[in-house]
Amino acid sequence: MELFKHFLQSTASDVFVSPVSISAVLAVLLEGAKGRTAAQLRLALEPRYSHLDKVTVASRVYGDWRLDIKPKFMQAVRDRFELVNFNHSPEKIKDDINRWVAARTNNKILNAVNSISPDTKLLIVAAIYFEVAWRNQFVPDFTIEGEFWVTKDVSKTVRMMTLSDDFRFVDVRNEGIKMIELPYEYGYSMLVIIPDDLEQVERHLSLMKVISWLKMSTLRYVHLSFPKFKMETSYTLNEALATSGVTDIFAHPNFEDMTDDKNVAVSDIFHKAYIEVTEFGTTAASCTYGCVTDFGGTMDPVVLKVNKPFIFIIKHDDTFSLLFLGRVTSPNY
């Protein structure tokens, strides 16, 4: 969540990240880290997701032949390790990596790696793929053109999907948010948070706050209008990780369990993600006080038009594992 908040506060445009993919890379680094370096990585790691159905997570380690890698690290990553010569054939290795990523994301992530320096000693790649249908699917014939307010004064025409059904919904008026849970098949769901004041809600957003809103939600009959969208994002994670407390890997790290080479440090960590939300589903390569309106007895249907910037979270329902986090300010399809 902290990495996500970093990007929310550093850009006004759309944001999309996968904590799962980021954690897969950090987990490989942790296998070779000791001391403070290892402690920082542990604090930043999300839980492991390998047991989740319909989620494909894969990682691969490319080590240069010049790097003296310890047997302990080799044993830990043995099924994912490939010995290469970055100095001799960086272009070929780049193409091999891009083919590997494309194959594991159903060709949704292409050209994941733009270039590789001949001086590279170790390169770690992680890929995630998620494709699940809505439990209650939108009907394409009911998708219409609608207005989406990018700002208070500027709007654009988008493809607005419509559906009337029972959803978990909450209107937390004293915090200025509405939230709806859109269920997928196989025990996943998307939480859509529609803030009155986007910047204010983003500043105070936390996992515990989201959980508290969900606990306040009730099953309501909702007339929902929701924009169809897709986006692809690309980030360098160095600064975001540093603000989350992961600093040592970039300067003077302790990778004692990986190698005796004291000059090995992480130069950059890149992250690329893709999501597509349609009528059929999604493809994507605490206790807090709240005033919730209680209508009592039979409640009137809710009319919810998601026609302004919103935050979304794709989660595993049983574990509340966060697979993807995003903000949509200007939907495109």
Curated annotation (Swiss-Prot):
One of its GO terms (molecular function) is serine-type endopeptidase inhibitor activity. It is found in: Host cytoplasm. This is Serine proteinase inhibitor 2. PROSITE patterns: SERPIN. Its main location: host cell. The gene is SERP2. Weak inhibitor of the interleukin-1-beta converting enzyme (ICE) and of granzyme B. Does not form a stable complex with ICE, but can for a stable complex with granzyme B. SMART domains: SERPIN (SM00093). GO terms for biological process: symbiont-mediated suppression of host apoptosis. InterPro entries: Serpin_CS (IPR023795), Serpin_dom (IPR023796), Serpin_fam (IPR000215), Serpin_sf (IPR036186), Serpin_sf_1 (IPR042178), Serpin_sf_2 (IPR042185). GO terms for cellular component: extracellular space; host cell cytoplasm. Keywords: Host cytoplasm, Host-virus interaction, Inhibition of host caspases by virus, Modulation of host cell apoptosis by virus, Protease inhibitor, Serine protease inhibitor. Signal peptide: none annotated.
